[in-house]
Swiss-Prot record:
One of its GO terms (cellular component) is fungal-type cell wall. Keywords: Cell membrane, Cell wall, Disulfide bond, Glycoprotein, GPI-anchor, Heme, Iron, Lipoprotein, Membrane, Metal-binding, Secreted, Signal. This is GPI-anchored hemophore cfmB. The keyword Magnesium does not apply. Residues 97-171 have a biased composition (Low complexity). It holds the Pfam family CFEM. Heme binds at residue 45. The keyword tRNA processing does not apply. Residues 94-171 are annotated as: Disordered. The gene is cfmB. It comes from the Eukaryota.
């Protein structure tokens, strides 16, 4: 079974080589793999192969891996020539363009990732600073409120103290007056008693 598969691949490679005599040997396996999987009836049916939009994208990466720059250029020329002869001309990207595009894409992706990471880090720092400032502001507000309450209590006590003193003074004055009135009444009673005794004796 393995021998039959190998023979089939070699036969297909021979057909591809015969159909594309200017194609380097390093690219034959690439052509066999791509042309045998695109749905066309045979490997040599380039009128069909060249109408497949995926032809170039399927063959190019394999050729870039297997062949050097000079051989890649030869493959591009051979494919363009063969498809033009089959009545279905195609265009092939310049050799090295795909690699350059892939490199630029990777660089752009990396830059975007770094930018996103930097933005996320800045946002995190900003959020942390805001969170740290909020408790400090709350503490300051609480301290100010506590100080205001203490001052208000002190002022209330201070204002109440004179009133207490006034009340004490009033009470003392009332007691004194009451005492004086009692003394006067006692004196008057004494005088009346003496007068009554004198009248009795007379």
């Amino acid at each position: 079974m393995h021998f039959s598969r190998t023979s089939l691949i070699l036969f297909a490679a021979g057909l591809a080589s015969a159909q594309l005599p200017n194609v380097p040997g390093c690219s034959l396996d690439c052509f066999v793999a791509a042309l045998s999987a695109d749905g066309c009836s045979s490997l040599t049916d380039f009128a069909c192969h060249c109408q497949k939009p995926e032809l170039v994208s399927n063959i190019t990466p394999c050729v870039q891996s297997a062949c050097n720059i000079a051989d890649q250029s030869s493959v591009s020329v051979a494919v363009v020539s063969q498809c033009s002869a089959a009545g279905h001309p195609i265009s092939v990207p310049p050799v090295g363009a795909a690699s350059t595009t892939a490199s630029e894409t990777a660089t752009t992706t990396e830059s975007s990732t770094q930018t996103t990471t930097g933005t996320s880090s800045t946002a995190s720092k900003t959020s942390s600073s805001a969170a740290s400032s909020t408790p400090s502001s709350s503490s300051a507000s609480s301290s100010h409120h506590h100080s205001s309450s203490s001052a208000l209590t002190t002022r209330t006590l201070t204002s109440t103290e004179p009133s207490s003193q006034s009340t004490s003074a009033s009470a003392a004055a009332t007691t004194t007056l009451s005492g004086n009135a009692g003394s006067e009444k006692a004196n008057v009673a004494g005088v009346v008693a003496v007068a009554a005794a004198a009248l009795y004796l007379l």
